[in-house]
Design a protein with these regions (language model features):
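Fe(II)/2-oxoglutarate oxygenase catalytic core
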Residues: 1-127
């Protein structure tokens, strides 16, 4: 295909250029998603999370709930965001847990065996 190129103002450094030199991939391999306002009521979710029982485990930093919380519609919402089907929703032991970390604790960046991971931040006015 022959490249088409139009410069609205070729004599200056301003203006715009229309071109077919590059195009977007029609089927990108998305590996990262951001969803704002995930919960309808994040303050209530946070209050609920703060009332749960957390335990300390030497295997990771911070505190986590022992219980897993699978709230109605969350799996489907994540599937919609990713445009993928989640097949082992309840099988992975870290799924649906609340975690709490204190300010100043440096996170440990790592990779587990699952294909995807998600985090919902509930700290109000976080930096």
């Amino acid at each position: 295909m022959k490249n088409k190129h139009f410069d609205s103002s070729p004599q200056t450094e301003y203006g715009y250029i229309n071109s077919n030199q590059f195009s977007a991939n029609p089927l990108p391999n998305n590996r990262f998603w951001v969803a704002e306002n995930f919960y309808n009521n994040p303050e209530e979710v946070r209050d609920f999370a703060l009332m749960q029982w957390y335990h300390d485990d030497p295997g990771y930093l911070g505190l986590r709930t022992r219980k897993q919380f699978f709230f109605e519609g969350v799996k489907e919402k994540i599937e919609g965001i990713m445009n993928k089907t989640i097949t082992k929703w309840e099988d992975y032991e870290m799924n649906g847990r609340f975690q709490s970390s204190k300010a100043g604790i440096k996170p440990v960046y790592h990779c587990d065996s699952q294909q995807y991971a998600a985090a919902v931040y509930l700290t109000p006015n976080a930096p």
